[in-house]
Amino acid sequence: MEFSPPLQRATLIQRYKRFLADVITPDGRELTLHCPNTGAMTGCATPGDTVWYSTSDNTKRKYPHTWELTQSQSGAIICVNTLWANRLTKEAILNESISELAGYSSLKSEVKYGAERSRIDFMLQADSRPDCYIEVKSVTLAENEQGYFPDAVTERGQKHLRELMSVAAEGQRAVIFFAVLHSAITRFSPARHIDEKYAQLLSEAQQRGVEILAYKAELSAEGMALKKSLPVTL
């Protein structure tokens, strides 16, 4: 996926009210960006970080600029726009860049499923194969090259794991897919120190047949793509 038009660079002043961030451009202008991330953004929003933003041509938007990437002061590149996790995963599936998810003839998005009537991110189908249900999570929390999810307690994420276990019990294929959008991460684990219940459910889900995949994206101000499988430790 390529950014078109190219992203623009600025320096972060502050993130506030969850959805807003003030930045200063190289020519000294101060702008307010829309921040499309409701998470804690730990390590992704330190004042002084370089940010890369896109600009919408929609004149009705109150905040036409969107925060897309952070380049931390340690040099790591992080995608902070959580919408890209699903878009990049879909692109990688269609391009058959994810070997574990190759060979299906149909991809559907936002399909209702399960007793709790969740919406699965993707469902893959093919003749003579069980349906494959895929839930995507964006990973940006890093500590010493270790990637973690979640970055805050997530009851919604816990619900998704319960639903996936039900799917696997019915004989369908169930996959939790962690899209790693942080250039410094080399391995993945659930964030037991943040949400112990989620970590417990993830281990239980694996035991009950839910597949766990983690793929890392190549990230730059020019474009992004999921490329590399990472080891997962529960």
Swiss-Prot record:
Disulfide bonds: none annotated. The keyword DNA-binding applies. The keyword Aminoacyl-tRNA synthetase does not apply. InterPro entries: SfsA, SfsA_C, SfsA_N. GO terms for molecular function: DNA binding. Pfam families: SfsA, SfsA_N. Keywords: DNA-binding. Residues 201-220 bind DNA. Belongs to the SfsA family. Binds to DNA non-specifically. Could be a regulatory factor involved in maltose metabolism. PANTHER family: SUGAR FERMENTATION STIMULATION PROTEIN A. This is Sugar fermentation stimulation protein A. It comes from Escherichia coli O1:K1 / APEC. The gene is sfsA.
